[in-house]
């Protein structure tokens, strides 16, 4: 369990669900706001970040955090979590460095498959 995942989502329910899916194989750290996500990323240096697009600070807070992470850590692996499956938003995230995305609602197998693609 040496690989670390940062789960950044304002929903405690979503963080709990993702933690339950992934904590058997990976170390999990969490953040409930964009600011906390930035702080946790700097402190914990996760191998992969699962980042919600819409956070309490604003509709595109996750995109702002993605940009900050990418500027400070080129090559950081960030998978966006979105309830907004719009092509324009997804393209914007990929342009800013997101390696992938998961659309809510998602199932357990989709999460595992996506994470394993980047962490094994």
Predicted segments with their positions:
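Conserved acidic segment of CheY-like receiver
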Residues: 2-13, 18, 49
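Two-component/phosphorelay signaling modules centered on CheY-like receiver
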Residues: 12-29, 118
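Short hydrophobic/Thr-rich beta-strand motif most characteristic of the beta2 strand and flanking loop
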Residues: 26-34, 40
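Short amphipathic alpha-helix used as the core "switch/output" element in two-component signaling
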Residues: 39, 61-74
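Active-site beta3 strand of CheY-like receiver
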Residues: 44-50, 55
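C-terminal output helix
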Residues: 88, 106-115
């Amino acid at each position: 369990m040496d690989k670390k995942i940062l789960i950044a989502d304002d929903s405690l329910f979503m963080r709990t669900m993702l933690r339950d899916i992934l904590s058997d194989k990976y170390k999990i750290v969490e953040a409930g706001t964009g600011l906390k996500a930035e702080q946790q990323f700097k402190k914990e240096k996760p191998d992969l970040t699962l980042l919600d697009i819409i956070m309490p600070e604003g509709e595109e807070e996750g995109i702002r955090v993605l940009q900050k992470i990418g500027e400070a850590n080129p090559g950081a692996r960030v998978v966006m979590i979105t309830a907004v499956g719009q092509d324009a938003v997804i393209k914007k995230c990929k342009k800013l460095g997101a390696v992938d995305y998961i659309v809510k609602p998602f199932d357990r197998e989709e999460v595992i498959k996506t994470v394993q693609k980047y962490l094994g």
